[in-house]
Each structure stands twice: as C-alpha cells, then as structure tokens.
C-alpha cells in the first residue's frame, strides 16, 4: 500500500492488455487480496467491459493491439464521463518515461513505466482511485 494514498478496500481492476507477459506483470505487482483483477484482451470492447464489470479502475497497456492504449483510455473515459464526473480512472502502462505526454494527452489518471515494481503500481492505482491529479510513477524517472 502506498504511503499517503490509502487504497480502498476491494478494488475491481480491469486489465486491458493483449500480451501475456504484460498481464502477468500486472498480476505479479498486484498481489493484495483486496484487488479483484479482470483480464480483457480486446481493446475495442474495453469501455463496455469496464461498465459491465463495474470496474473501479482500468489498467491499459499503451501498446495494446492496433487500437492503442491512448484510444482505449479515451474510449473508457468518454463512455464513463458525466457532467460531474470525469469518468472511470485509467492507469496507462508506458514503454518509456518520455511517453508521459501521451498519458496526459489521453487523460490517464496515473501511469507507470514498464517494467514497474509492485510499489509503483500500487501508488499509481491509489492515485487513480482517489482521482488525484495526474502524476508519473516510473522506475526510470529522472
């Protein structure tokens, strides 16, 4: 659990990635039994699945399929936003720290750079769930 950002009990997390090692890395980082992880490989239906599964947060790989993580992030946020709520928070998994601008542009609530530690992922999740201002969490951040 990240200091300063207590995670709510029982968070349902939709993991959108089409590569097994990315899914495995997210699962390995999120070992807290308070997390319920739901894997989803089709980026085109991620927003509908997030709503159907009543997800609290969506974790999206930037390199997911042909659609890409930016488009998935926008799709989830657009499908879940209301006049008083900016939409379901998304944690974007980046390949390089220089891709932070992509996460900001897509409207991600938080992001981490692969490979990431369990602490970095928990911190990003906590920020997203608490709807904090976007802020990078990256192992190679300068």
Sequence positions of predicted segments:
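His-Asp phosphorelay/catalytic-motif detector in bacterial-type signaling
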Residues: 81-89
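Conserved phosphotransfer microenvironments
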Residues: 56, 60-78
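C-terminal output helix
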Residues: 116-125
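Conserved acidic segment of CheY-like receiver
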Residues: 10-21, 26-27, 39, 58
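Two-component signal transduction core modules
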Residues: 58, 111-112
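The C-terminal output helix
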Residues: 126-142
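Alpha4 helix (beta4-alpha4-beta5 surface) of REC/receiver domains from two-component response regulators
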Residues: 71, 92-110
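Short hydrophobic/Thr-rich beta-strand motif most characteristic of the beta2 strand and flanking loop
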Residues: 34-42, 49
